[in-house]
């Protein structure tokens, strides 16, 4: 009743409320009111508020605001807003101090800070599954945005936590389409390596992959060579591998929330449709675009059908899906781990590098390396209080 009691005093003098803010943190209430009233009654108002505060057992402080100061405050409302999100298994005072030092050095002001995750357990046995996320709402124009982003990424790499910097626009608050890479993103393996081992050509496939990473051959050529080595593999092997796919931590929780919130979701993969469709049926993805292996008489032919889904094609598909769903490209999110994902990560409104190599992380701008894929929810702005683990069941 503190807010009610104090505003009732102001109401008796017909005061206008120009600004109001309140927070209750660990049983400590902080209430700020900016109000306008007739100068002739300001003394009476302050006296009554002091009496009411004493009666309620709270402290009260008054700060007169001149017309000039008020008008300057109004002018500042046009400044850009930014959202800085920090995320990890746990967060330390050192990490928060480092982040806020960078914010201050860029001449930005922190308007508000809120915790998005639930209350952290003290039990060390469950800490490995804990999540901690804090969101800063920041106002102003950075003196050097690129430097700020680089410092955040460097800090993230050395201090074992993830960080996101997003401009607080209309689109940040209404993302509608999320596109995922599959191998080493939705699942903790590379399916083609699993198939190669079962076909007895694991070392040969690894050698081709190494050549591609050295830049000796491009993705399309390496893909053709690796698929050719799978010739003769029984189709039943794919079913066996699909049923044992190691799904990445947080996928089920993330997909439950995204589906309940009405997001469209897609798998855009340089892997194979067989496994993408398996995940689609299990978790309810709306779209799957991947490479289709040719099968004849129950065995792989060593060939593929249709166009190769490479990095360029992933970006094209993201734009196509946004158009089909009538979604602005700024409302899209892309998540991936490899260089092949960079085109879609840089095309999307929000590109997130997931457990990726440094080059991919630096280019994407946003990254998650410390927790599972449900970390995506916090970068969108979801709070744990909106997320119910108890309803994480699928009936597709």
Describe every region a protein language model picked out.
Residues 170-220, 224:
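Active-site neighborhood of HAD-like aspartate-dependent phosphohydrolases
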Residues 211, 224-230, 242:
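Long, charge-rich alpha-helical interaction segments
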Residues 232-396:
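C-terminal cap/substrate-recognition subdomain and adjoining C-terminal extension
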Residues 87-89, 179-181, 268, 335:
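Short hydrophobic segments within beta-strands
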Residues 40, 44, 94, 143, ...:
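Conserved active-site and cofactor/substrate-binding residues in soluble primary-metabolism enzymes
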Residues 1-175:
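A conserved regulatory-domain signal marking ACT and ACT-like small-molecule sensing domains
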Residues 2, 95, 186-189, 341-344:
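Short glycine/serine/threonine-rich phosphate/pyrophosphate-binding segments
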